[in-house]
Regions:
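Short amphipathic, basic-aromatic surface patches that mediate peripheral association
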Residues: 156-172
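C-terminal motif of bacterial Sec signal peptides marking the signal peptidase cleavage site
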Residues: 5-9
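Aromatic (Trp/Tyr/Phe) and Gly/Pro-enriched flexible surface segments
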Residues: 12-149, 175-222, 226, 232-259, ...
Length: 287
């Protein structure tokens, strides 16, 4: 009797369906949700200074998952935690998202910029280069091994500031209106373990797949929209050779309030609001 029941349960249609779904999750090419960020938890980087989104209650304030070189660079000018380019989006005293904004800076005798474009990204800040080589101070990427990231869905609002300027008064052609920029870059970690930075983010030879979009102001102004950003292979051979058992990879997610902020070009008052970011991976077999 017991044997008969066992055989019957193995042939049960619901059991077969559940087993099929489980097996499907481990087949190469299947898209699965991997991570999501809602920006409801924030951490004080240091007392009285700025805050950053936190991914766990026990996250180390000196080694956060999210980083912002624009915030760290602004510590010399700010007098309040609410002044920074990246701050929490708060409702009734509780965080419900992130605000990334382009703010007024300081330019004097060739040092600094009149507009500081806010940027929030996964990675670190190299404080040694903040003043002399600011683009190299942004260390983009965090370890990633759940699969090959293919989709980044994010819910956002964006408004552009009134006037686009060059923060160092250079005579260059300027865009008529500011836009936000979002990048997702999946790259291989080579022997030197170096990071992509503001110079190499879009061009480094180690990039496996990437996605990029520029966002115009949302209309109506106060409505939330969801955008689906797809990462496409940059190097087919490197993409096909992805192997999480023998190699290491990082994923860089970069959100900026001014799409040409790295060139000191932007509009004071441009503001990108984020409420949720979700990732989907394409499973890569381990054999």
């Amino acid at each position: 009797m017991a044997l008969a029941v066992a055989f019957a349960s193995c042939d049960d249609p619901i059991t077969r369906k559940e087993r099929s779904l489980i097996d499907r999750q481990y087949k190469e090419g299947v898209l699965t949700a991997s991570q999501s960020f809602d920006f409801t938890r924030w951490i004080d980087v240091s007392k009285g200074a700025y805050r950053l989104p936190s991914i766990s209650a026990d996250e180390d304030a000196k080694n956060t998952y999210w980083a912002s070189a624009s915030n760290q660079g602004y510590t010399m000018l700010s007098s309040s935690p609410t002044d920074y380019p990246v701050v929490p989006l708060e409702e009734n005293g509780a965080a419900h998202g992130a605000i990334i904004r382009s703010i007024k800076g300081f330019y004097f005798f060739g040092i600094g910029t009149k507009v500081i474009a806010g940027a929030l990204y996964t990675g670190q800040v190299d404080a040694r280069n903040l003043v002399g080589k600011p683009l190299e101070s942004t260390l983009f990427g965090q370890p990633y091994s759940s699969g090959i990231p293919e989709i980044v869905d994010f819910t956002y609002q964006y408004k552009a500031g009134e006037k686009v300027i060059h923060g160092q008064d250079k005579k260059v052609e300027l865009p008529s209106e500011d836009r936000a920029a979002v990048s997702a870059v999946f790259y291989e970690v080579t022997d030197d373990a170096s990071y992509l930075n503001g110079v190499t983010l879009q061009t480094d030879a180690r990039i496996v797949a990437k996605g990029y979009v520029e966002l115009e102001p949302t209309t109506p102004a106060d409505t939330w929209q969801t955008y689906r950003l797809r990462l496409t292979p940059v190097d087919e051979a490197r993409y096909e050779a992805v192997d999480f058992t023998t190699k290491k990879y990082r994923l860089a997610l970069v959100f900026s309030s001014s799409f040409r902020g790295a060139e000191y070009i932007g509009a004071v008052g441009s503001e990108l609001r984020l409420r949720e970011v979700k990732l989907q991976d394409r499973i890569k077999s381990h054999h």
